[in-house]
Design a protein with these regions (language model features):
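Charged, often Cys/His-bearing segments associated with DNA-binding zinc-finger transcription factors
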Residues: 1-114, 146-262
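Short conserved beta-strand segments at catalytic cores or DNA/RNA-binding microdomains
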Residues: 55, 114-130
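A short acidic/small-residue loop/turn micro-motif
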Residues: 137-140
Length: 262
């Protein structure tokens, strides 16, 4: 992930959001503001980061900010997440384009929104990084084709191997778009993709389900890219290496977030 996101040095801003963190942010970096926003960009970007990085509700984020003397309503946090979340995610997506593993895992899960059933189609690479996610009303070949076209456009390259469950829509769509790609279809082969759905389930519980298909799509599109940045595979790292990579990830997040022309 270092090469993928162009990590550089920077000041760490930890998840605990301590007083020391805020002092570091305000003293080490020049104050920046987004147009037509009275709060500093550092506070807005941190609120957005908290909301998408952790399974927190909007009111949870409001309380975390209030505990540090920053009085922001949960409605304002919601507006920030809606306005800036996808902008940040798109910057991350552009940086990582075409740099994922060449083995892709695809999966779909059901999401119920206002009593209507939707299917959330998701693709991850062999290392668990989210390639893309697409909410659709169907679970058929046409839906699989839309996901694969989105993946090919986003990555700019086809995978070497594609792993799925036994849903026939995958093989039919692959035959049309990527006939030369090896396709392995078996229950359990796409565990990485299945596990990647857990974040959506956790958010569903916090929100008492998504309120609209648009809200769900916006969340999964943003969350996946931010989760990628902080997916550091801790079990394979020494404590020192993990701290260094986390610092680099936070530095990259700040660099991207504060470069947005809002």
């Amino acid at each position: 992930m270092q090469a993928m996101y162009g990590f550089g040095g920077g000041v760490a801003l930890t998840a605990c959001f301590s007083r020391l963190d805020i002092r570091i942010v305000m003293t080490e970096f020049p104050a920046a503001h987004f147009r037509r926003h009275r709060f500093p960009a550092e506070i807005i970007t941190h609120a957005v980061w908290l909301y998408f990085r952790f399974p927190l509700s909007l009111r949870d984020v409001e309380d975390l900010l209030a505990e540090r003397g920053i009085n922001v309503s949960f409605q304002t946090v919601s507006e920030w997440a809606a306005k800036f979340g996808l902008k940040f995610a798109n910057q991350l997506r552009r940086r990582s384009r075409g740099q994922f593993a060449d083995k892709w895992q695809l999966d779909e899960m059901v999401v119920t929104i206002k009593g209507k059933k939707y299917w959330l189609w998701r693709a991850v690479d062999a290392n668990g990084y989210v390639l893309d996610a697409l909410l659709q009303s169907r679970r058929n070949k046409a839906a699989a084709l839309r996901l694969m076209r989105k993946l090919l456009k986003g990555q700019g390259i086809a995978p070497r191997v594609m792993l799925t469950d036994k849903l026939r829509s995958y093989s039919a769509a692959k035959a049309d778009l990527m006939p030369k790609v090896e396709h392995r279809s078996h229950k359990g082969l796409n565990n990485q993709a299945e596990n990647s759905h857990l974040a959506v389930r956790r958010r569903e519980r916090r929100m008492m389900r998504f309120k609209s298909a648009r809200q769900c799509q916006r969340f999964v599109s943003t969350h996946g890219q931010i989760a990628n940045l902080f997916l550091l595979h801790r079990k394979d790292l020494t404590a020192a290496d993990h701290r260094q990579l986390r610092t680099h990830a936070i530095s990259t997040w700040r660099e991207i977030a504060l470069s947005i022309d809002a």
